[in-house]
């Protein structure tokens, strides 16, 4: 499945290079018009990251996200700075299909597990930003990559499998925003090891060949942000390469 994505800072569509707020590119685009274009080209799920909220949870762009949800017919998943159950409930109430939880799953797993129990495993996607070291260990980073987490991907997945983890978005940090291609070996391994989890691949997608490689890795979906914004290819072309299941 093709999952077009936009990142938002102060209401503007942006891209960061490897998660660095000092390496920001701003695009002169309307967020809603951009997402409606992706929807019109056949996307069935859209991914929105509130980078302002990720940096400062008090400045979450909830009003904008409500406007986006209202202006779209397809499902949206939203992440960025979600720290409390009130915020989860609010996003679900304004029409968000799935809430993306990152750092908090590492820092406060019991809290996040309680949300799986309350809202169901379809309502939450874990976002695991992974640093892979020279030994091949997959270490999950926290807080928008500004600090290391120290927990292995495998231990975190094992913990959340107990509450029915179904959706997980995995980014190899070294690839994000680089357009160097996805880490397909990682997704092949994850899909084989955890066949009951729908893995969303993210980071580094530059070409339709990259899209095909992720499709063949047996990931369930691929998040594409920068490549679409800079017109490397269109959503329509990506869906032709990997039809929505």
Swiss-Prot record:
Gene3D superfamilies: Aldolase class I. It is found in: Cytoplasm. Its EC number is 5.3.1.16. Pathway: Amino-acid biosynthesis; L-histidine biosynthesis; L-histidine from 5-phospho-alpha-D-ribose 1-diphosphate: step 4/9. It catalyses: 1-(5-phospho-beta-D-ribosyl)-5-[(5-phospho-beta-D-ribosylamino)methylideneamino]imidazole-4-carboxamide = 5-[(5-phospho-1-deoxy-D-ribulos-1-ylimino)methylamino]-1-(5-phospho-beta-D-ribosyl)imidazole-4-carboxamide. GO terms for molecular function: 1-(5-phosphoribosyl)-5-[(5-phosphoribosylamino)methylideneamino]imidazole-4-carboxamide isomerase activity. The active site is at 7 (proton acceptor), 129 (proton donor). The keyword Transferase does not apply. InterPro entries: Aldolase_TIM, His_biosynth, HisA_bact_arch, Isoase_HisA-like, Isoase_HisA-like_bact, RibuloseP-bd_barrel. NCBIfam families: 1-(5-phosphoribosyl)-5-[(5-phosphoribosylamino)methylideneamino]imidazole-4-carboxamide isomerase (TIGR00007). Belongs to the HisA/HisF family. This is 1-(5-phosphoribosyl)-5-[(5-phosphoribosylamino)methylideneamino] imidazole-4-carboxamide isomerase. It comes from Shewanella frigidimarina (strain NCIMB 400). The lineage of its organism: Bacteria, Pseudomonadati, Pseudomonadota, Gammaproteobacteria, Alteromonadales. The gene is hisA.
């Amino acid at each position: 499945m093709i999952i077009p994505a936009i990142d938002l800072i102060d209401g503007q569509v942006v891209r960061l290079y490897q998660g660095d707020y000092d390496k920001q590119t701003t695009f002169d685009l309307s967020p809603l018009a951009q997402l409606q274009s992706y929807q019109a080209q056949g996307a069935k799920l859209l991914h929105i990251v509130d980078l302002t909220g990720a940096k400062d949870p008090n400045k979450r762009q909830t009003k904008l996200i409500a406007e986006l949800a209202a202006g779209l017919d397809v499902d949206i998943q939203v992440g960025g700075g979600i720290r409390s159950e009130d915020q989860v409930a609010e996003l679900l109430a304004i029409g968000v299909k799935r809430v993306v939880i990152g750092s908090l799953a590492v820092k406060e797993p019991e809290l996040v597990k309680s949300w799986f129990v309350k809202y169901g495993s379809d309502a939450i996607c874990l976002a695991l930003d992974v640093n892979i070291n020279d030994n091949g260990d997959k270490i999950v980073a926290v807080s928008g990559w500004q600090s290391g987490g120290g927990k292995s991907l495998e231990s975190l997945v094992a913990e959340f499998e107990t509450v029915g983890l179904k959706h997980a978005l995995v980014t190899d940090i070294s690839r994000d925003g680089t357009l160097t291609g996805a880490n397909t070996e990682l997704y092949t391994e994850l899909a084989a090891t955890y066949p009951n989890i729908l893995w969303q691949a993210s980071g580094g997608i530059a070409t339709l060949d990259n899209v095909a490689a992720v499709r063949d890795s047996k990931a369930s979906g691929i998040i594409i942000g920068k490549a679409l914004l800079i017109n490397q290819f269109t959503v329509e072309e990506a869906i032709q390469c990997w039809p929505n299941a």
